[in-house]
Amino acid sequence: MINAVQGHRTNSVQEAINYLKGDHDHKGVERNPKPRFFTGSENDCLIACESIDRKQKYVTGTLAFGPNERPRDKELMEVVKSFRATFMAGLEHGVNFTDFWNIHEDKNRIELNYVIPLTELTTGRQINPFPPGKAKEYFKAAF
């Protein structure tokens, strides 16, 4: 499994989520099978990002599995829980942070895509699951 972090984003989180939910990839090729929702909350991500005054509002990424790795949804949920525990350590999902996850299977592999608003929900302070420099690589290696 590869954790490909696309980075911190400044454009509309709705555009990012629409792309992940969309029937076509970035080249305009129809996705078959269609993307499917997995966990988290699109609406909560939209609300959280609208409350952020900072330039960078959210981060996106993909957990890409190899062609021979076919985890079932129950196993994928364990991956999400482990991801949250690693990159959002000490924070409770739904209380301190929110996210959105969906699945793409159109490239002969499972891709578990995520969007995470960069704000702690109870304080409005910035959070950064992928800090710059060596810390980011340390977290990715730990996961």
Predicted regions and their residues:
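N-terminal nicking endonuclease/strand-transfer module with a His-rich metal-binding environment
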Residues: M1-F143
